[in-house]
């Protein structure tokens, strides 16, 4: 393990030059204090958990101090927002402090969110509020524990700096980690501004550092785009299988690495609703839960358009056509595992779709259903679960088909239970749990947010005394829509 003074910086993106980012120093927040830190994320930087206890920790990630090797820069990019192209976005309140090289040879971006105004702030104050910072922190650490690729969050630093949104709130900073912060929108920016030399420079940078195995291909950029499609197909399959709704799938919020990125008004499903809209600002439902698959494909097509100076259109189209079958294969495999099924058979897709149709419109908690399905033998589990369904006879028919499917595979119930509990979480980051932790934190009590973070780091393991986190949400906490305000 290292100390905060010993981090090894290797700022590769900064070396691309001023066409790609602008030098900006962090604007410190007043009276910085640690709200919560992630030992697992700090370990990616070879830092021990105790590093967050040092006074200099809050000063560094509250914008008061800076390593001499750091090169803070605001990145420029554009993107399609709710389907409309915005020609100039960029880091409006975040700074890429630099890239840390860990002992495993991995580069990790240090991105400080809420670091003040930049040339891309667009009338904004450059700040992030405590509320949104806690939400991003919790999700960034909860999703990887579920096996969903994501950026990571090392810490949240609170302050006494006031900011105004719908009401007066306090500013905070979040340290986000990722192997890269390059977005689809980076490529769009250089394509639509006709800076094709810079577009190729960016593509070469991403190829060298993040898709090196594509470098030996006959057409490296075509191979790289195909991998981007493959990674996103698997990512979206994991979102859908675990009931995660991102809420703002603009192309500037899509990582070139195929990881979950830029958390805003996200949600995990409570009662299953394929049409759930978690973003209060999404009047048309563009980014509803069921639309995430076609929107991901749309976003990949937007990226493909930006790559046309580098890759033949036919090759881009061929890769795009792979998205849906790849997604379906990953999704069906995940759902099969969630149902405790180990062997693929022809009617598995129909079995999954029929279950979701029975869930729709019923008071079925999406996460708890799968957990409880594995608790006992199918007959007993199905008998307990049927009361949650509106059409119980239809559910009984599904249950009988499922029971026969389990019976055909054979095996002991104890092994089935262990197998299902290993992929079906008992603890899920529900919006009402995050809201309760936020309300306590806004009063200066960080106990709940720290407890929730520790709990969600082990979502599949039953943890003594944590029964209240396994319950269905109260009426006020069901289907919460969250504002983009942050």
From Swiss-Prot:
Binding site for ATP: 90, 92-93, 113, 125-126, 176, 183, 262
Keyword Metal-binding: yes
Active site (UniProt): 252
EC number: 2.7.7.-, 2.7.7.108
Substrates-to-products reaction catalysed: L-seryl-[protein] + ATP = 3-O-(5'-adenylyl)-L-seryl-[protein] + diphosphate; L-threonyl-[protein] + ATP = 3-O-(5'-adenylyl)-L-threonyl-[protein] + diphosphate; L-tyrosyl-[protein] + ATP = O-(5'-adenylyl)-L-tyrosyl-[protein] + diphosphate; L-histidyl-[protein] + UTP = N(tele)-(5'-uridylyl)-L-histidyl-[protein] + diphosphate
Classification via Pfam families: SelO
Cofactors required: Mg(2+); Mn(2+)
Residues where Mg(2+) binds: 253, 262
Gene Ontology MF term list: AMPylase activity; ATP binding; magnesium ion binding
Family listed: Belongs to the SELO family.
Function: Nucleotidyltransferase involved in the post-translational modification of proteins. It can catalyze the addition of adenosine monophosphate (AMP) or uridine monophosphate (UMP) to a protein, resulting in modifications known as AMPylation and UMPylation.
Name used for this protein in its record: Protein nucleotidyltransferase YdiU
Organism: Pseudomonas paraeruginosa (strain DSM 24068 / PA7) (Pseudomonas aeruginosa (strain PA7))
């Amino acid at each position: 393990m290292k100390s905060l003074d010993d981090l090894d910086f290797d700022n590769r993106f900064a070396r691309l030059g001023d066409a790609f980012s602008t030098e900006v120093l962090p604007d410190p927040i007043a009276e910085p204090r640690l709200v919560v830190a992630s030992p697992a994320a700090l370990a990616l930087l070879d830092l021990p958990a105790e590093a967050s206890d040092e006074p200099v920790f809050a000063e560094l990630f509250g914008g008061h101090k800076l390593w001499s090797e750091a090169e803070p820069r605001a990145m420029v990019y554009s993107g399609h927002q709710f389907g409309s192209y915005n020609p100039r976005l960029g880091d409006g309140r975040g700074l890429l402090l630099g890239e840390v090289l860990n002992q495993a040879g991995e580069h990790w971006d240090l991105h400080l969110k809420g670091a003040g105004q930049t040339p891309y702030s667009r009338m904004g104050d450059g700040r992030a509020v405590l509320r949104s910072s806690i939400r991003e922190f919790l999700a960034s650490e909860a999703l990887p524990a579920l096996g969903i690729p994501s950026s990571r969050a090392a810490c949240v630093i609170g302050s006494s700096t006031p900011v105004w949104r719908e009401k007066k709130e306090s500013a905070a900073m979040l340290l986000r980690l990722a192997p890269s912060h390059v977005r689809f929108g980076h490529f769009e920016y250089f394509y639509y501004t006709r800076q094709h030399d810079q577009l190729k420079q960016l593509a070469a940078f991403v190829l060298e550092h993040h898709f090196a195995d594509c470098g030996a291909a006959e057409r490296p950029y075509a191979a790289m785009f195909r991998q981007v499609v493959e990674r996103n197909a698997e990512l979206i399959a994991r979102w859908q299988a675990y009931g995660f709704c991102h809420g703002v799938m603009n192309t500037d919020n899509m990582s070139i690495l195929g990881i979950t990125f830029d958390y805003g008004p996200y949600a995990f499903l409570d009662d299953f609703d394929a049409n759930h809209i978690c973003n209060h600002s999404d009047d048309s439902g563009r980014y509803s839960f069921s639309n995430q698959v076609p929107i991901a494909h749309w976003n990949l097509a937007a990226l493909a358009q930006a790559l046309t100076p580098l890759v033949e259109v036919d090759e881009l189209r061929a890769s795009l056509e792979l998205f849906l079958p790849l997604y379906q294969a990953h999704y069906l495999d995940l759902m099969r595992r969630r149902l405790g099924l180990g062997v693929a058979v022809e009617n598995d897709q129909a079995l999954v779709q029929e279950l979701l149709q029975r869930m729709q419109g019923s008071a079925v908690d999406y996460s708890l259903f799968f957990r409880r399905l594995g608790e006992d033998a199918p007959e007993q589990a199905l008998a307990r679960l049927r009361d949650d369904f509106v059409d119980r006879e239809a559910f009984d028919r599904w249950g009988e088909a499922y029971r026969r499917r389990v019976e055909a595979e054979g095996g002991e119930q104890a092994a089935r239970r262990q197998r299902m509990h290993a992929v079906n979480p008992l603890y899920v980051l529900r919006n009402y749990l995050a809201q309760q932790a936020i309300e306590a934190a806004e009063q200066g009590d960080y106990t709940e947010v720290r407890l929730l973070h520790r709990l969600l780091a082990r979502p599949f393991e039953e943890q003594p005394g944590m029964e209240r986190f396994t319950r269905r949400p109260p009426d006020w906490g069901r289907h919460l829509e969250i504002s983009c305000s942050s």
